[in-house]
C-alpha cells in the first residue's frame, strides 16, 4: 500500500501562502537555500499524501512596494509592479527547490512573462493540480494596491480549495504578539468577525473578507516548524482555524 493511500488526510486540495519573509530565513534579504530545502521537503511530504497543492508566494524578502512608497515617496503602482517581479523570483526559486526533490511544479504568473513561466489561467491551474503538479502562483493578482494575502484568498476560492493555509512564525493566532507579550493567548478557533473586530493583523482586511464571504477557512500555523504542515493536513498539530 502506498503512503498516499495509507495516509488519512483532512483536506484534498489546499492553498498555502508563503511569505517572502519566510523564505528569507535569518539572512535578512533574498532566499535562504536551507529554508528552501526544508520547505521543499515539507511540501513533498504533503504532496505524497495525494493532496493537491497550490502555493501563493510573497516578495517582501526582496522588495515591498508599500514600504518603498512610504519611505521614499515613490509611485505606489510602479512599486507594486516591482514587488510582483520579486514574487516571480521567489516562485522560480521554490520551483527549483521542489524539482530538486522530484516534485513536479509549474509557476503561473498573473502578469504575462512567457519566457520563464505560464500565464495564470484558472482552468489551466486546476488541470495542473489534477495531474499531480504543485502550482506556484506569482505576481499577486496582477494589479497594484492588492497584497499577496488577497491573492492567496482569491486563488484559494476560485480554485476550489478546501482551506487557505497561512504560514507564519508562530503556531496560530494570538491575542497579542507572543514574542513581545508573555500573556498573549492563543486561539484554537476564532471567527472572521472576531478577528476583524479585535484588529488581529494576520491577513489584510480584503483577504479576510473574501474568505469570509465564501466560507473558506483560514488555517494559521508555524511554517518554520518542520513537519507542521503535514501534521495539520492529517488533522494533528498546533494551529488556529479562522471560520464563519
UniProtKB/Swiss-Prot annotation:
Entry's EC annotation: 2.7.4.22
The keyword Transferase is annotated on this UniProt entry: yes
Keyword Thylakoid: no
Compartments (UniProt record): Cytoplasm
Binding site for ATP: 17-20, 60, 64, 168-169, 174, 177
UniProt function note: Catalyzes the reversible phosphorylation of UMP to UDP.
Subunit structure, interactors included: Homohexamer.
Binding positions for UMP per the UniProt entry: 59, 80, 141-148
A cellular component annotation (GO) from this entry: cytoplasm
UniProt lineage: Bacteria, Pseudomonadati, Pseudomonadota, Alphaproteobacteria, Rickettsiales
Family label: Belongs to the UMP kinase family.
One GO molecular-function entry: UMP kinase activity
Biological process (GO), any one: UDP biosynthetic process
Source organism: Ehrlichia chaffeensis (strain ATCC CRL-10679 / Arkansas)
Protein activity control: Allosterically activated by GTP. Inhibited by UTP.
UniProt keyword annotations, A-Z: Allosteric enzyme, ATP-binding, Cytoplasm, Kinase, Nucleotide-binding, Pyrimidine biosynthesis, Transferase
Pfam short name (any one): AA_kinase
InterPro entries in the cross-refs: AceGlu_kinase-like_sf, Asp/Glu/Uridylate_kinase, Uridylate_kinase, Uridylate_kinase_bac
Catalytic activity field: UMP + ATP = UDP + ADP
Name the UniProt record assigns to this protein: Uridylate kinase
Residue span of region Involved in allosteric activation by GTP: 25-30
